[in-house]
Amino acid sequence: MRILKLLELVVKVSLFTIALSSVLLAFLIFRATDAKVEIIRGDHPEVYDDSAENEVPTAASIQRKAILETLTNLMLESQTPGTRQIREEESTIPIFAESTTQKIISVSDLPNNCLNASSLKCEIKGISTYNVYYQVENNDVIYSCVSDSAEGLEKCDNSLNLPKRFSKVPVIPITKLDNKRHFSVGTKFFISESLTQDNYPITYNSYPTNGTVSLQTVKLSGDCKITKSNFANPYTVSITSPEKIMGYLIKKPGENVEHKVISFSGSASITFTEEMLDGEHNLLCGDKSAKIPKTNKRVRDCIIKYSKSIYKQTACINFSWIRLILIALLIYFPIRWLVNKTTKPLFLWYDLIGLITYPILLLINCLWKYFPFKCSNRGNLCIITHKCTKLCICNKSKASKEHSLECPILSKETDHGYNKHKWTSMEWFHLIVNTKLSFSLLKFVTEILIGLIILSQMPMSMAQTTQCLSGCFYVPGCPFLVTSKFEKCPERDQCYCNVKEDKIIESIFGTNIIIEGPNDCIENQNCAANPSIDNLIKCRLGCEYLDLFRNKPLYNGFSDYTGSSLGLTSIGLYEAKRLRNGIIDSYNRTDKISGMIAGDSLNKNETSIPENILPRQSLIFDSVVDGKYRYMIEQSLLGGGGTIFMLNDKTSETAKKFVIYIKSVGIHYEVSEKYTTAPIQSTHTDFYSTCTGNCDTCRKNQALTGFQDFCITPTSYWGCEEAWCFAINEGATCGFCRNIYDMDKSYRIYSVLKSTIVADVCISGILGGQCSRITEEVPYENALFQADIQADLHNDGITIGELIAHGPDSHIYSGNIANLNDPVKMFGHPQLTRDGVPIFTKKTLEGDDMSWDCAAIGKKSITIKTCGYDTYRFRSGLEQISDIPVSFKDFSSFFLEKAFSLGKLKIVVDLPSDLFKVAPKKPSITSTSLNCNGCLLCGQGLSCILEFFSDLTFSTAISIDACSLSTYQLAVKKGSNKYNITMFCSANPDKKKMTLYPEGNPDISVEVLVNNVIVEEPENIIDQNDEYAHEEQQYNSDSSAWGFWDYIKSPFNFIASYFGSFFDTIRVILLIAFIFLVIYFCSILTTICKGYVKNESYKSRSKIEDDDDSEIKAPMLMKDTMTRRRPPMDFSHLV
């Protein structure tokens, strides 16, 4: 009976359980379950929870859903899904509580989870130089956040490297790879604001929006004025800015200056150190950039201080060596004499330094007998070798010169008295310190210390409006009209501006002031503008600006920023301020703004032809063709090389100078852009889970995005259920993932289409000055010369059709690179557009890209290992092509400079024979024009174009007062002539006359008037007066090693000129032969002199006087002369 009752109880319990489960199952049949997705992306695991999507509806959940919908409505305008709408009034929304009573709350009262990170679960996802990207979790909802402040994030996970504060210096992104190495000052997270399917909600500081996050390289932004240094202090400049905070730094291209930006407010002074004056550093301040010109501070200071005195300048410039020589002389005589005189009074000093150097002294004394050069009596070094006694160093008495009979240091006797003492004993110390060798060394150390003290005391060197009418304004960043500039945007309009068809009415709230004026708005602006501020913006700034104001608000207006250095329009200024706010609206607009450079920092250190270091060569014509002298010239195709040729016709009295200078040589590549690749910094995901159904059921709530989608089914079965879910082999989890790319480390991939050897060649002298680009494909030709390239080396590691990578350091890399739309595991994934949008990726994630896990009790989880293709790690296998950075032109070509010879440059010069003849009459010069453009008292000089018409062919010298010229001789042909000439003037040559002297004859001179001179201030921030710059150039030319080498070879120019291209080789051979010849004759003379001294011939000279003649005979040089047979006669008695 008991068994039957027990069975009955079990059946009833089972039926009750089944009934209860059926009711619950029916209630939850279409409900989704909680699930959690975990993204693992390198060192940045990301966890996202969808519990807000799947929880059982309660009053709290309904309220939270209403809040999220309100935030979404603030961001998205339902009627125009591609834009954002700013509310003019405070919006209110109804929220239903459990009692179904309506409650009204303000949008400003809604909680901002990103600002409450300190009290919520949060995790740092990435730290840049100027902001931080993090995520917070509240009520199982994950919020993505970007903030310019680190406040309240100290307790977040991965906050170990979080700085206490971020710099507030305004910056904007750099999108052009070529500019990154020049202007990069760190990185910053930006939001690319869009409403496409690949975006997601994100909050920047306290402003919610929709878009994608990317890490970008940034540069400084802002209004900054750089004041040139004055003559009194030529290495200090001052910078000023009207903005509240501005940043500056001195940067060498390619240098990492991520945390070296210096902020200032108002003004600041910068003093350049000698390292900054190498010509490679740039001063960056806001939008402004300035190249610090190459200046030898030591030389220039001496040139200025001792102007016009070459000897004082030389002494001053070489003072660093002269001061060492002076110290050496002081040590050798006065200091040594002083030390020798004070040895006894300073015995404590010698004991002290002896104690300090005792191990060294002990070692030297013990090893002295093994030294190759020893003194026989003093214990000092001796150059002349001779036998030395072993007892020489054991002078134990300071005052005595006597030596000890036995030297304990060198003694081999075992029973010596000193052997019973240790090396560290006082007996051994006194013995070692008092030896002559040790005492001489201690005195030498004392002399050196005194010399160093004196050396340290010696000097190192000798030497647009937005105003309604009067008092009502619109200020960017504030949605209300104001009456003046403000620190904080007011809560409502402070004035009113009514724009009518024929007039404008302005009124100030709180006063009775009403002003009327004519309608002078921008014409042809057709757009709707209802509020007062919209009318003002449409009137003064136009409809395009009004569209930006409505749909793309400024969170920080930067009211003091004008963008005057970049010449920004009102639209461009607004977009630049949006970039300062961390928002990217359009890649093309951003690329345009960030590519604007104010200043000369990108200018290369291009100087005039360095004639002082170029070799000189006399050149005689090879043949006469059609009445013209033909000169054949061959040069090595090497950048920086060249020759100064002196042209002759064997009869001409004056040689004509002709200079060829190869400025640069390299290879010009034509390329086709493929894609951009960048590392994945972090990952964002979104998904939806269901308790029953399959992927199709899940996709009804989480639609396919088109790429990087995933779906897992089934996710509900025995042992893998969550609370209130009893489905078996049902359910699905679907979603998508999006990567956050580090565009700071992006590479652009190109395909090589064509390569050509190119040389930039400058020609100066008799033909005037001009620079031309010569290629190997088509020979260059003009009226007087032809040039052609014969290439020896063309294969430099890059082949046609090969893929190359342009890195963030502006270098070119080659290697295994994936082609576009090729999923091969080589460097080149992810494949993106320039603005970081994927163009080739996985459409659906595979099983290897993620893993799924669950538990009997708890939430399901998905671990995504890789969101799309990622092979950026293979960049280590790429090979850098050249150490010289390159710059791309319109993403279609670049020039790769080479530092070695690529072949030969052959030039044929045809000069009319009349150039070498005296003009038969005064030439007629008509239609003259001389126009100049440049600067005075500067290194660049005035670039002038001289044009005229001549009736004769002749050679002429040219000159002009107060100016030096790049060339002083021109070849004038019959007909039209045009020359490029550079003039360096100390005064404005406007309306002055340039004089032409045909064949140097002043009797038939011709004058040409300077028509126009446009003087432009150079960008150089260090003024270099032309007078001192000329002296410096002259000094460098006179003291140049190349100039000296060319000078000592110059006597052989005439002979070597007959050997053509072997000119310089023959000069060196002749110089070496001459040196050997001089050495040979000097050796003979030395032998004669030695014999003369050795035989003492000078003692054998005698003065012979004949009896009958008072003439002095030549002295006899014989050593063994005969003696007189009789004594000399005495004539004293005749007196």
Curated annotation (Swiss-Prot):
GO terms for cellular component: host cell endoplasmic reticulum membrane; host cell Golgi membrane; membrane; virion membrane. The record marks 484-485 as: Cleavage. Residues 177-195 are annotated as: Non-covalent dimerization. Disulfide bonds join 114-145, 122-156, 224-285. This is Envelopment polyprotein. The keyword Glycoprotein applies. The cell attachment site present in these glycoproteins may help in the adhesion of virus to cells. Residues 36-314, 485-1067 are lumenal. Residues 367-484, 1089-1135 are cytoplasmic. Residues 1-35 form the signal peptide. It comes from the Viruses. InterPro entries: Bunya_G1 (IPR005167), M_poly_TospoV (IPR014414). GO terms for biological process: fusion of virus membrane with host endosome membrane; symbiont entry into host cell; symbiont-mediated perturbation of host process; virion attachment to host cell. Residues 437-484 are annotated as: Signal for signal peptide peptidase. Belongs to the tospovirus envelope glycoprotein family. A motif (Cell attachment site) lies at residues 41-43. The chain crosses the membrane at residues 315-366, 1068-1088. The keyword Glycoprotein applies. Tospoviruses are transmitted from plant to plant by thrips as the insect vector. It comes from Tomato spotted wilt virus (strain Regular2A) (TSWV). Keywords: Disulfide bond, Fusion of virus membrane with host endosomal membrane, Fusion of virus membrane with host membrane, Glycoprotein, Host endoplasmic reticulum, Host Golgi apparatus, Host membrane, Host-virus interaction, Membrane, Signal, Transmembrane, Transmembrane helix, Viral attachment to host cell, Viral penetration into host cytoplasm, Virion, Virus entry into host cell. Glycans are attached at residues 116, 210, 588, 605, 980.
